[in-house]
């Protein structure tokens, strides 16, 4: 078949409609002689064959999602290769559906085999979406938060649609306080705080000891270089460790909404107001793509290369 002339505008329009890759869109338009609807169908039919090839590509964009159902909450991360796909409604619907099932599934292995409304498993549904969207997609991780009594607060930062965004946080407050609305409001505020301040643990006893020792060593060596006496160094190191705790331990951080108070002090005040003990049972904070290698691409160059090639 001789290649017909396909405009960049047509390729862009098909990509916006289907979410498929630029090269796949151009190929589909060529194969269907520029017929837009047939090209869309072509992508749906042919995509599955290409899904395996796409599975090896780096997927560091996408969305995180938070879902709360009563006293159970989950956070998931589903990755795509580009931010463009994260704005695609089909991909957003997929992430929403997976989050809804995650609350029931409890573990990621169970979630992958969970049957969706289509009758396909979550894993099969992801593969089919790799086909139609044209990028590697991965259900990277999930975590669950369950409490027997209290409230769960959720917050999603940089939302693209409700409950889907770049950072998703859950905070579980264990309490028998009667005023659930106030307890939920506090949990929500702490969730916003966690999103912005990225604590590493709830208290200093649960902080990674290896991390503490690493920081202690850095502080010690820095003080040594300053030529301080050993007895002064010991005091300086402990002072810097306390400051380190105030930066990374949730209960010791200055509260985002009342900076003059620590999170622990805010909780104490809430306990007095609500007449009940309040304990942070757990928090989960997922930031999109953390720990994944990113691959930079120039969208304009990609369009030019594909439409000219």
Swiss-Prot record:
UniProt cross-references to InterPro entries, sorted A to Z: EF-Ts_dimer_sf, Transl_elong_EFTs/EF1B, Transl_elong_EFTs/EF1B_dimer, Transl_elong_Ts_CS, UBA-like_sf
Keyword Repressor: no
Domain of life per record: Bacteria
Any one Gene Ontology cellular component term annotated for this protein: cytoplasm
Keywords annotated in UniProt: Cytoplasm, Elongation factor, Protein biosynthesis
Location of this chain's protein in the cell: Cytoplasm
GO molecular function, one term: translation elongation factor activity
Main localization category: cytoplasm
Region (Involved in Mg(2+) ion dislocation from EF-Tu): 82-85
Function as written in the Swiss-Prot or TrEMBL entry: Associates with the EF-Tu.GDP complex and induces the exchange of GDP to GTP. It remains bound to the aminoacyl-tRNA.EF-Tu.GTP complex up to the GTP hydrolysis stage on the ribosome.
Family named by the database record: Belongs to the EF-Ts family.
NCBIfam families: tsf
Protein name: Elongation factor Ts
